Amino acid sequence: MSINLHSAPEYDPSYKLIQLTPELLDIIQDPVQNHQLRFKSLDKDKSEVVLCSHDKTWVLKQRKHSNTVLLMREFVPEQPITFDETLLFGLSKPYMDVVGFAKTESEFETRETHGELNLNSVPIYNGELDFSDKIMKRSSTKVIGTLEELLENSPCSALEGISKWHKIGGSVKDGVLCILSQDFLFKALHVLLMSAMAESLDLQHLNVEDTHHAVGKDIEDEFNPYTREIIETVLNKFAVQEQEAENNTWRLRIPFIAQWYGIQALRKYVSGISMPIDEFLIKWKSLFPPFFPCDIDIDMLRGYHFKPTDKTVQYIAKSTLPMDPKERFKVLFRLQSQWDLEDIKPLIEELNSRGMKIDSFIMKYARRKRLGKKTVVTSR
C-alpha cells in the first residue's frame, strides 16, 4: 500500500495537536458524551489549560520535539502523475494523493488530573446578619449566584465540581454562592442533629423540608441563619443522598460525623497541650447531642493528632507541616519518636507525588520494623 505525498507546508501556530488516549477517543466517538468535552482555564495568560468531560479532567502539557509533524489532507492533483513503476520496488501503485499543508514542532500530552474549583470570588459565610450588606460593599469582586456559573468558570468537570462543592460546605445565601465557615458549619450540624432527634426524625431517611421545619421550630430569634439552603448544604456534606428513594432523602454518615466532632474536640481541648487519651475521649463524647448514636475511637482521628506518650494525645494541623518530605519526617519524629505505620500514613501520603508504594516511600526517609503484629516507623 502506498500514497503520493505532496508537500507545501508552512509553520502555522494556529494548529494545535492533542494526543488522544483511548478513553478520550471513546468519548469523542460517543454522540452522547462528545458534546460535553470542554477546554477550560482560570485565565488567558498564566493558567494551565485543561480538557473536561462530564466526570473527568485532563491537563494539557506542551511537548516540543525535534521531528517535524506534518498536517495532511487528501487532494486531487490538477495533472495526472506519471512515474516509472520500477521505482516502486514491488509495491502496489499509489491509491491516493495527500498534501502536507502545515507543520508543527510540538503537541499536547493529556494527563488525567484532579479538577479544581475557582473559589477566588466565593465569600465565606459565618452566619452573620449583615452578610448581604458586606457583599454589596465588595464592588470590585464579582458575585456568583449559581453553582452552574461557578462550574463554567472552574477547571474541572461538572461531576468533580459538584462533589468538591459539597465537600467544602458550599451553599447559597441571599442569592450569593458562598462557603460556610468551619465554625458555622459545626453549629449548623449540631443544631440539625438536635432538632432532628427532638422531632424523632429517622436519621437514615432525612429530607430537606422536614429537617428545615424541625430546625425552625427551635429558633426563637427573629433572625434564623439556618435557611433551607443551609440545611441542604449540611446534608450534602454529612449525609449520602439516597438515589433509589422516591423522595429526595439523605442518610447520615454517622462515622464521618463522629470524626468531625472528634477533630473539633482535638482543636478545642488539646491544641498546644496534651491530655490523657481516656480523658480526651470523655470530652469528645460530651460534644455530641445527648443520646446521639455513635461509637468513637482515637484511631478515627488519624492524621489529626500525635501521641507525646503512649497514653496522651495532642492536636496536629497538617497544613502547618513542611511540604518537603525530608523536613516533614524530621518534624514528625521531633513530635513523636516512634509512629505506628497507620498513624503516620495520613500525615505523609500527600507528599508521595510519584505514587510509590507507601512502604517504599517511607523507607526513603525513615526506618520501618515489625513489633509483634504492628509495623512501626522510626527515624534513621
From Swiss-Prot:
Q: For this UniProt entry, what's an example GO CC term? A: chromatin
Q: Which domain of life is it from?
A: Eukaryota
Keywords in UniProt for this one? DNA replication
Q: Name one Pfam family in it.
A: Dcc1
Keyword flag Magnesium: no
- Keyword Lyase tagged: no
InterPro entries, alphabetically?
A: Dcc1
Q: Among the record's GO biological process terms, what is one?
A: maintenance of mitotic sister chromatid cohesion
Question: Any stretches that span the bilayer, and where are they?
Answer: none
Other remarks on record?
Present with 1660 molecules/cell in log phase SD medium.
- Describe the family membership recorded for this protein in Swiss-Prot or TrEMBL: Belongs to the DCC1 family.
Record text on subunit structure and interactions: Component of the CTF18-RFC complex, which consists of CTF18, CTF8, DCC1, RFC2, RFC3, RFC4 and RFC5.
Entries under PANTHER family matching the protein: SISTER CHROMATID COHESION PROTEIN DCC1 (PTHR13395:SF6), SISTER CHROMATID COHESION PROTEIN DCC1-RELATED (PTHR13395)
Question: In UniProt terms, what function does this protein have?
Answer: Component of the RFC-like complex CTF18-RFC which is required for efficient establishment of chromosome cohesion during S-phase and may load or unload POL30/PCNA. During a clamp loading circle, the RFC:clamp complex binds to DNA and the recognition of the double-stranded/single-stranded junction stimulates ATP hydrolysis by RFC. The complex presumably provides bipartite ATP sites in which one subunit supplies a catalytic site for hydrolysis of ATP bound to the neighboring subunit. Dissociation of RFC from the clamp leaves the clamp encircling DNA.
Which protein, by its recorded name, is this? Sister chromatid cohesion protein DCC1
Species for this entry = Saccharomyces cerevisiae (strain ATCC 204508 / S288c)
The gene is DCC1
